[in-house]
């Protein structure tokens, strides 16, 4: 696994916008064809990003962008959308059924769920990310909504060098209430030590807390099985050197148990596609190198 000095945190920070840009473009599809609904995503962008979002109102250009994405990274279009849809549903479920009133989003990027989901408006939330992403997002949210929601606290961090617990405590998160943790598209960008450090933090969560996270497959990161994703391996692992860590699906349940969590679901993107893409009638690829986990603190 990568050592501490080889982790390019700036490179990881630059990936925070793309998922939400894809979500914004998705809103230009007819309503019955959309994989996810998000009326805020497009409002976060200006300049060239907004230009590309706007021109995809033209169907031929919209389909061209989707097809180009799928050509280089099969499943690369739908992966952002289905995982966000899944997390949205688990969050709403946790708030309404499990009475969870606290949320921590580690690696929040430009994600909009805290600002668009009605169920999330009255919970106490902390969004944690690199300073450059936090600052840009605050400005974008203030511009889109007129002010920044008082129930959301933004927390800047370096996931490699800093302790999550200490940083959150300084911003008012005490960790004494059941919490919904989101760890979306973070683990591959850090090293094994930082992953374990994150789970050391998760292990202290109150019983009944929920955790949802994505992970890239270990054999892909190691180059043992590329799953038809040669371009992605060349770019993310070899060239840009921003993907460092992967989990083995056969070991994920034991790893969770060791850290005080019970696996609820470890799901691949083929099944997520059946849930969220198939009903739209669209035919999109499947990202076989990533999976989604949902767990409960025990």
Model-derived features with residue positions:
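Glycine-rich phosphate-binding loop signature in dinucleotide/nucleotide-binding domains
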Residues: 94-99, 171-177
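Conserved beta-strand signature within the Rossmann-like core of class I S-adenosyl-L-methionine
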Residues: 204-220
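Short, conserved loop/helix-junction motifs that constitute active-site signature segments
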Residues: 117-122, 173-175, 203-207
């Amino acid at each position: 696994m990568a050592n501490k000095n080889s982790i390019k945190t700036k490179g990881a920070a630059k990936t925070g916008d793309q998922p939400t840009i894809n979500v914004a473009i998705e809103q230009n599809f007819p309503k019955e064809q959309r994989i996810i609904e998000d009326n805020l995503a497009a409002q976060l962008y200006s300049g060239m990003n907004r230009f590309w979002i706007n021109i995809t109102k033209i169907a031929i250009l919209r389909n061209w962008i989707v097809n180009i994405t799928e050509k280089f990274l099969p499943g690369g279009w739908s992966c952002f959308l289905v995982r966000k849809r899944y997390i949205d549903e688990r969050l709403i479920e946790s708030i309404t059924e499990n009475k969870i009133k606290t949320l921590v989003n580690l690696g929040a990027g430009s994600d909009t769920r805290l600002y668009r989901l009605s169920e999330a408006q009255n919970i106490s939330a902390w969004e944690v990310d690199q300073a450059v992403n936090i600052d840009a997002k605050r400005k974008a949210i203030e511009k889109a909504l007129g002010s920044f929601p008082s129930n959301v606290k933004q927390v800047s961090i370096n996931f490699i060098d800093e302790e999550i617990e200490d940083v959150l405590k300084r911003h008012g998160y005490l960790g004494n209430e059941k919490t919904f943790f989101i760890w979306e598209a973070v683990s591959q960008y850090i090293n094994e030590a930082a992953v374990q450090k994150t789970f050391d933090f998760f292990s202290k969560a109150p019983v009944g807390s929920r955790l949802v996270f994505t992970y890239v497959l270990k054999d892909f990161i190691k180059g043992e099985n590329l799953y038809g994703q040669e371009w992605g391996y060349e770019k993310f692992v070899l060239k840009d050197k921003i993907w460092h860590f992967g989990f083995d699906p056969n070991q994920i349940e034991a790893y969770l148990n060791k850290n005080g969590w019970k696996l609820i679901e470890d799901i691949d993107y083929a099944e997520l596609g059946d849930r969220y893409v198939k009903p739209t009638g669209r035919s999109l690829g499947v990202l076989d190198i990533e999976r989604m986990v949902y767990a409960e603190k025990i």
